[in-house]
């Protein structure tokens, strides 16, 4: 099945490059291009793509606000969003994830990781660039540690294994290969971890793993 994508970036050359990269993959179809946040919001609401690929810093509305309006907790029928940017500041990463983004990549991530993130988002999964996850954990380590939240129920042995790999920035597919289990099994474990830990995304799972010295 073809994954329909809207690409939003205010830099014409960058946007054209992203469209060209995605156009090389038969399973992906770019159905719209936006040069600012207002246009991105309008196109996404009208075209209902499978994935919105959006830059953080754009005129009109920034990528975080666009994400919040199409994928936030108050949205009844959210769109999958992957945020891509040259700015790797922690507030952008956390802001995007809290707004509902399913992926966060830096623009130097490379085509393969970009396509993986789009496929993951369309499948209801999430992919955060491993270098972003590692840096977030390093930043997290610098603050005064808080008492970690106790899980609602004890984690199973398999959930503990998945927890550590998520904290390393691994995708569900990579975890499935490492543990010799199906992709759906990994997704179930990640969903269970989020429920038990009260985590909203994979970064919060990773932060909990760090706080409890799992990694």
Segments the model singles out, each with a brief description of its role:
Residues 92-98, 102-103, 107-157, 161, ...:
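Short, flexible helix-to-coil linker/hinge segments that flank and couple to helix-turn-helix
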Residues 14, 54, 59:
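The feature encodes the CheY-like receiver
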Residues 2-14, 18-22, 155:
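Conserved acidic segment of CheY-like receiver
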Residues 169-204:
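Recognition helix of helix-turn-helix DNA-binding domains
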Residues 9, 55, 85:
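Active-site residues of response regulator receiver
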């Amino acid at each position: 099945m073809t994954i329909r994508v809207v690409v939003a970036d205010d830099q014409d050359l960058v946007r054209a490059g992203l469209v060209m990269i995605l156009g090389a993959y038969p399973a992906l179809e770019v159905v719209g291009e936006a040069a600012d946040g207002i246009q991105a919001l309008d196109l996404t609401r009208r075209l209902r793509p499978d994935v919105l690929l959006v830059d953080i810093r754009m005129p009109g509305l920034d990528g975080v606000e666009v994400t919040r309006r199409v994928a936030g907790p108050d949205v009844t029928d959210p769109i999958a969003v992957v945020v891509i940017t040259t700015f790797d500041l922690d507030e952008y990463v956390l802001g995007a994830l809290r707004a509902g983004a399913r992926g966060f990549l830096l623009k130097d991530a490379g085509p393969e990781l970009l396509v993986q993130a789009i496929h993951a988002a369309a499948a209801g999964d999430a992919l955060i660039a491993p270098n972003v996850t590692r840096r977030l954990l390093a930043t997290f380590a610098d603050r005064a540690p808080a008492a970690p939240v106790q899980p609602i129920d004890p984690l199973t042995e398999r959930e503990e294994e998945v927890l550590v790999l998520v904290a390393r920035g691994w995708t569900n597919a990579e975890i499935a290969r490492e543990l010799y289990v199906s992709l759906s099994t990994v997704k179930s474990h990640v969903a269970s971890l989020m429920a038990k830990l009260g985590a909203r995304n994979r970064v919060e799972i990773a932060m909990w793993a760090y706080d409890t010295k799992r990694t």
